């Protein structure tokens, strides 16, 4: 990016910050503050609200520095746009969450993960600097030694909003080679995850990316991928072919780097089947531009609002849309419980180890433990005697029992005491007093559990 272009982008950012501060100042004292956003990847649905701070101008990549392998990015920039800006330079973010419209600010204030997380940790661990508008309306710049920087991940916009980030990048190669390795036994699968993540290789070949797909208790696959300078062929899963189905059919595959990064977006992992677009006839009729996770999410939001599927269903359907981190040595136990009590399939696996040993107080993972993110996104039919939320509570209890953690992007059912035990209530309250003394932003428990 030229010096002139960087100067223009910097000026744009400064003007956007000034305009946002004016918006904040215009909100009556004591009135709650929130964002007005066009997109979301959260699954905590609540009643529509008008107004809010307009952050539409915070969606740009401000600079890409190839010498330092860093990028300056605004908080509402999507990973899709960031990747499009960095790949021409042979670079990418250290962790690129699976869905195109996840924003940098959202991934840092919440949690993100992908197949590079076993070596690069979580997205916020590659952030060097954050510019934040706090709940008090102040704009501050913080780094790794600051309490707000450490406490920002898993705060979900209750301490402030990300305006700008400086993040690390890493080099890429043109192609990614994938090996889909089957396992009939979850314990053996977990053992290999531990081995691969410790050694960075499998059977003598390097492994740069690790994730997995569980189709049943007797059928799970690890996808072990590595960079490649060339490819004998490349597959395309952005049209008629469906990526997750290829896992069972191919032992080796090749993708371009961009298609690898977005391999899960076209079918929202496998959740597009709920909309009928995996049927071959329907698939051919749907324009490719609509085969995207953000399109499906809008359909789900509309359905939640109007309760169409709930009215059509004979049984009460409980949404079970969660990502949980389980210590790898308890993974098989969790999967056995999950198959028995919940019964959703497929299930996604993604190993993660913290990169920064200093840790992140609001999501207190042990830096000495390799965790496996287990993702599952569907609905479960409840028996007449079951209350809505009962299956999610079963999962929450099991995750706590096994020493795991649960992301807060979707429905949560913890009581308040348990919630603050899990998410470091004392530290959160100290941060809240310092950066949102008047309580203009919602409390984390109120936002994530009470949906306020």
Residue ranges: model-predicted function:
Residues 1-452:
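Noncatalytic alpha-helical scaffold of FAD-dependent oxidoreductases
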């Amino acid at each position: 990016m030229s010096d002139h272009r960087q100067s223009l982008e910097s000026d744009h950012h400064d003007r956007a910050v000034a305009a946002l501060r004016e918006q904040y100042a215009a909100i009556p004292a004591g009135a709650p503050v929130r964002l007005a956003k066009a997109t979301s990847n959260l699954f905590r649905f609540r009643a529509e609200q008008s107004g809010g701070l307009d952050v539409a101008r915070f969606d740009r990549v401000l600079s890409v520095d190839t010498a330092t392998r860093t990028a300056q990015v605004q908080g509402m920039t999507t990973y899709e746009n960031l990747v499009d800006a960095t790949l021409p330079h042979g670079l990418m973010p250290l962790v690129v969450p699976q869905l195109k419209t996840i924003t940098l600010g959202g991934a840092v204030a919440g949690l993100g993960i992908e197949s590079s997380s076993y070596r690069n940790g979580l997205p916020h661990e590659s952030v060097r600097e954050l510019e934040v508008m706090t709940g008090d309306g102040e704009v501050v710049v913080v780094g790794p030694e600051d309490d707000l920087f450490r406490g920002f991940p898993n705060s979900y916009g209750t301490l402030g909003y990300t305006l700008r980030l400086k993040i690390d990048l890493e080099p890429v190669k043109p192609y990614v080679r994938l090996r889909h390795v089957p396992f009939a036994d979850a314990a053996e699968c977990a053992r290999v995850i531990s081995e691969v993540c410790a050694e960075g290789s499998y059977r003598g070949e390097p492994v740069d990316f690790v994730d997995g797909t569980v189709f049943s208790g007797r059928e799970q696959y690890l996808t072990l991928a590595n960079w490649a300078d060339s490819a004998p062929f490349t597959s395309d899963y952005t049209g008629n072919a469906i990526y997750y189905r290829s896992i069972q059919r191919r032992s080796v595959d090749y993708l371009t780097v961009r298609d690898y990064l977005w391999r899960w977006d076209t079918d929202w992992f496998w959740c597009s089947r709920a909309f009928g677009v995996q049927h071959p006839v329907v698939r051919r009729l749907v324009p490719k531009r609509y085969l995207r996770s953000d399109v499906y999410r809008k359909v789900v939001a509309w359905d939640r609002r109007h309760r169409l599927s709930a009215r059509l269903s004979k049984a009460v359907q409980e949404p079970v849309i969660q990502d949980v981190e389980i210590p790898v040595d308890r993974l098989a136990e969790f999967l056995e419980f999950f198959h028995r009590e919940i019964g959703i399939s497929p299930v996604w696996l993604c190993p993660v180890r913290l990169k920064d040993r200093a840790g992140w107080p609001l999501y207190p993972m042990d830096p000495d433990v390799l965790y496996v993110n287990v993702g599952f996104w569907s609905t479960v039919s409840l028996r007449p005697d079951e209350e809505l939320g009962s299956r999610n509570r079963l999962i929450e209890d099991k995750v706590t029992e096994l020493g795991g953690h649960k992301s807060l992007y979707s429905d949560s059912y913890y009581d308040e005491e348990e919630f603050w035990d899990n998410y470091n209530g004392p530290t959160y309250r100290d941060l809240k007093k310092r950066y949102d003394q008047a309580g203009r932003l919602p409390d984390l428990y109120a936002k994530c559990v009470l949906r306020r």
